[in-house]
Design a protein with these regions (language model features):
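C-terminal and inter-domain tail/linker signature
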Residues: 1-221
Length: 221
């Protein structure tokens, strides 16, 4: 990627909404072979090419990420997705993407079950020199060609998907579980409020006179 914030939308749609070939192309073009993947439901640790015993086949972590995205498309062939915002921290090489999606299962009739969720995807990027085919030069020293160094592009080193708990619950416990969690959150807020109103003074006095602690952080009214 030359411009991660502008190009990431096409990459995400290729992975989640387009064809099998588009998925594979996006992963091969933009993900490093040892890319890792972290999601509430699954995890792929980073590893390079490993030979499968008793075969001539090799596998790397990017291949497993491809299988995850393929299974995602198999379960939900018609995913509705929108990208609300992107932000690139160039110093840390982190790209943040806020996404809204509607996930439905193909075997549930009449869309009786849908998960309308929001998530923040954090992509760890790595800037590497590339060859003539725009492939990363992994572990190689870039040599100048005609006095010019090979161009550098950003590649995805890893992906982490972050969900709020109420959004996560829509996948594992639909039909009201997220509402119960929201009710618990409101209850916890009430407990915090009541605790401050009725317990701040006795707690501050106890900490000050019995424990000798500085109580300015919970200064009483």
């Amino acid at each position: 990627m030359d411009y991660p914030e502008q190009q990431i939308q096409h990459i995400i749609r290729s992975l989640t909404q387009y064809s099998h070939d588009d998925q594979r192309t996006a992963l091969q073009d933009y993900f490093l072979p040892d890319a890792y993947f972290v999601h509430p439901f699954c995890r792929v640790p980073s590893f390079g090419n490993c030979k499968i015993p008793y075969t001539d086949l090799t596998v790397n972590s990017r291949q497993l990420v491809f299988y995850i995205y393929q299974w995602y498309r198999i379960l939900s062939p018609d995913i509705k997705l929108s990208i609300d915002s992107t932000s690139f921290d160039k110093d840390k090489n982190l790209l943040y993407v806020m996404i809204r999606q509607t996930f439905t299962l193909w075997f549930v009739p009449l869309s009786l079950w849908q998960a309308n969720v929001k998530l923040v995807t954090v992509l760890e990027l790595q800037q590497l020199s590339t060859d003539k085919s725009h492939k990363p030069l992994l572990g190689e020293t870039s040599t100048p060609v005609n006095g010019e160094r090979p161009p550098k592009l950003y590649f995805i080193k890893g992906q982490q998907d972050h969900y709020q708990i109420e959004d996560f619950l829509q996948f594992v416990a639909p039909w009201g579980a997220s509402l119960l969690w929201m009710a618990w959150q409101i209850y916890a807020t009430i407990i915090c409020t009541v605790g401050v109103i009725f317990l701040r003074t006795p707690v501050a006095l106890c900490q000050k006179y019995f424990l000798g602690r500085d109580t300015r952080a919970i200064k009483t009214l």
